[in-house]
C-alpha cells in the first residue's frame, strides 16, 4: 500500500533536554514499522515514553494544515487507511472540502468526512463563477436559454448566484458544495479503530536491552539530581 502522508515523529523527552531526535513514519504503517522507528529514537517505554510530531507532509493537498503535533499515531493510521480506500476522484473531492474548511477541526472530523463524501458534489477544474455558470447552463441545462441569446448571456452573474445558493467553494482542484446530504458520524473515537489499524506499541526489548535502558534511566536521574544540587551548594556558600 502506497504512502499517503508522513509525519516526523520526535522524542519529546530528548527535545525537552535540548536534543531533536526523530524520524519519519509513512502512513499507512504497520506495528513493526512503528516499533522499529520508536526504538531508533529511544522511545522504548523505559528510556523515554512520550513523542510529538514535528511536521507533516504528503500527497493529499492541504491535509497536513489540519493536523497537530500531538495527534494519535493510531488515529492517523486509521485516517490513512480510510483515505486509501478512496479512488482518485474522491481524494480530489476530499481535498476540495477540506480546503473549504468543513469538518477539519480534528482527525476525528477528517475520518468522518472521508466516509461521507457522497454529501458533496464536486466539479473538477471549475475555478470561476463564469466557468460554473457555463457548466450549469451549457452542460447541465439548468436554465433554458435560447441559442440566439447564449452569446449575450451573463454566465458569470448566473454562476455567482448559483455559488451563493449552493453555498459552494472554489478550491484549487475545482468547485465543491454540500448537496444537502446529512453527514453520518461513523467514527466516534479510538474505540472504533480496527485492531489491524492500531500500530502504536513500544518496541520489545530483550533482557540485555532492558538492563541497559534501566541503567541509562538511573544514570540520567542521578545526573539531574547532581545538577539540582550544585546551585543549592553555591547559594549556601
Positions of PLM-derived features:
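Non-Sec secretion/translocation targeting segments of pathogen effectors
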Residues: 154, 208-237
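Structured domain cores in non-transmembrane regions
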Residues: 32-107
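Extracytoplasmic/secretory-pathway segments with low complexity and glycosylation-like composition
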Residues: 93-95, 99-102, 106-138, 148
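Acidic, low-complexity, intrinsically disordered interaction modules
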Residues: 134, 140-172, 187
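N-terminal ordered "arm"
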Residues: 1-47
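Short, glycine-biased loop/turn motifs at secondary-structure junctions and
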Residues: 10, 16-22, 140, 157, ...
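Long, highly charged low-complexity segments enriched in Glu/Asp and Lys/Arg with interspersed Ser/Thr
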Residues: 160-207
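Short, surface-exposed beta-strand/loop "edge" segments at domain boundaries and coil↔beta transitions
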Residues: 14-19, 59-63, 182-186
Amino acid at each position: 500500500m502506497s504512502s499517503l502522508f508522513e509525519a516526523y515523529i520526535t522524542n519529546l523527552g530528548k527535545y525537552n533536554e535540548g536534543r531533536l531526535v526523530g524520524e519519519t513514519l509513512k502512513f499507512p504503517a504497520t506495528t513493526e514499522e512503528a516499533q522499529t522507528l520508536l526504538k531508533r529514537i529511544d522511545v522504548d517505554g523505559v528510556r523515554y515514553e512520550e513523542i510529538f510530531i514535528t511536521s507533516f507532509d504528503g500527497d493529499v493537498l492541504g491535509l497536513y494544515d489540519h493536523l497537530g503535533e500531538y495527534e494519535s499515531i493510531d488515529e492517523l493510521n486509521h485516517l490513512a487507511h480510510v483515505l486509501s480506500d478512496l479512488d482518485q476522484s474522491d481524494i480530489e473531492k476530499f481535498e476540495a472540502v477540506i480546503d473549504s474548511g468543513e469538518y477539519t477541526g480534528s482527525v476525528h472530523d477528517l475520518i468522518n468526512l472521508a466516509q461521507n463524501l457522497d454529501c458533496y458534489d464536486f466539479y473538477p477544474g471549475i475555478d470561476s463563477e463564469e466557468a460554473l455558470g457555463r457548466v450549469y447552463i451549457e452542460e447541465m441545462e439548468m436554465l433554458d436559454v435560447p441559442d440566439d441569446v447564449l452569446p449575450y448571456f451573463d454566465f458569470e452573474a448566473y454562476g455567482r448566484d448559483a455559488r451563493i445558493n449552493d453555498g459552494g467553494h472554489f478550491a484549487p482542484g475545482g468547485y465543491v458544495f454540500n448537496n444537502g446530504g446529512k453527514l453520518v458520524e461513523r467514527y466516534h473515537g479510538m474505540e472504533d479503530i480496527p485492531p489491524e489499524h492500531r500500530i502504536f506499541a513500544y518496541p520489545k526489548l530483550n533482557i540485555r536491552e532492558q538492563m541497559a535502558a534501566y541503567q541509562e534511566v538511573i544514570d540520567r536521574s542521578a545526573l539531574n539530581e547532581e545538577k539540582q544540587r550544585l546551585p543549592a551548594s553555591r547559594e549556601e556558600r
